[in-house]
Amino acid sequence: MARYLEVSDIVQQWRNERPDLDVEPMLVIGTLSRVSLLIDRALDKVFSKYKLSAREFDILATLRRRGAPYAISPSQIVNALMINNSTLTSRLDRLEQAGWLRRMPIEGDRRSVNIQLTDEGFALINRVVEEHVENERDILSPFSEEEKTHLRALLGRVEKHLVNNR
């Protein structure tokens, strides 16, 4: 089995090849990128059991956490998930075909619809979210509560910086 190339090894290769370039940011960003990829893979283990993608889970979860009647507009989903309309449309089509949500016409506006969980979608997301939370708990198990709080604060600062400067 090939040795896993650590981010620090990659950065050292850059230092060797480009000693004139300060590649220090690569240590943090490279690690964040790797961790993000590994987290996505770990989360997908739960989603794939239910034949869901991460985005499809996010759509169902967005509807579920809004409370009864578990219906919102497509634009609210787009804003909540930071995705574009074309991505949303294909995901909604698949979730609707699976019977987990439906498009509900809005009275007085023939062009607009709300997206609503079906009873089957409600039952599904309730099952999946329980496993999802346990999976997330396992992913974060190396950290103490204090470390998780600190990590969240640090990542929150990066998130805020990126949102404010895009």
Swiss-Prot record:
Disruption phenotype: Mutants display derepressed synthesis of both pectinases and cellulases. They also produce an insoluble extracellular blue pigment, indigoidine. The survival of the mutant, in which indigoidine synthesis is derepressed, is significantly higher under oxidative stress. Mutant is much more aggressive than the wild-type strain on potted S.ionantha. Keywords: Cytoplasm, DNA-binding, Repressor, Transcription, Transcription regulation. SUPFAM superfamilies: Winged helix' DNA-binding domain (SSF46785). PROSITE patterns: HTH_MARR_1, HTH_MARR_2. PANTHER family: TRANSCRIPTIONAL REGULATOR, MARR (PTHR42756), TRANSCRIPTIONAL REPRESSOR OF EMRAB OPERON (PTHR42756:SF1). It comes from Dickeya dadantii (strain 3937). GO terms for molecular function: cis-regulatory region sequence-specific DNA binding; DNA-binding transcription factor activity. Transmembrane segments: none annotated. It comes from the Bacteria. This is HTH-type transcriptional regulator PecS. Negatively regulates the expression of genes encoding pectinase and cellulase, which play a major role in virulence, and the expression of the blue pigment indigoidine, which is implicated in pathogenicity and protection from oxidative stress. Represses the expression of genes involved in indigoidine biosynthesis by binding to indA and indC promoter regions. Also binds to promoter sites in the pecS-pecM intergenic region and negatively autoregulates its expression as well as that of pecM. Induction: Negatively autoregulated. It is found in: Cytoplasm. The keyword DNA-binding applies. InterPro entries: HTH_MarR-typ, Tscrpt_reg_MarR-type_CS, WH-like_DNA-bd_sf, WH_DNA-bd_sf. Gene3D superfamilies: Winged helix-like DNA-binding domain superfamily/Winged helix DNA-binding domain. The presence of PecM is required to ensure the full regulation of the pecS-pecM intergenic region by PecS. One of its GO terms (cellular component) is cytoplasm. Pfam families: MarR. One of its GO terms (biological process) is regulation of DNA-templated transcription. Residues 25-160 form the HTH marR-type domain.
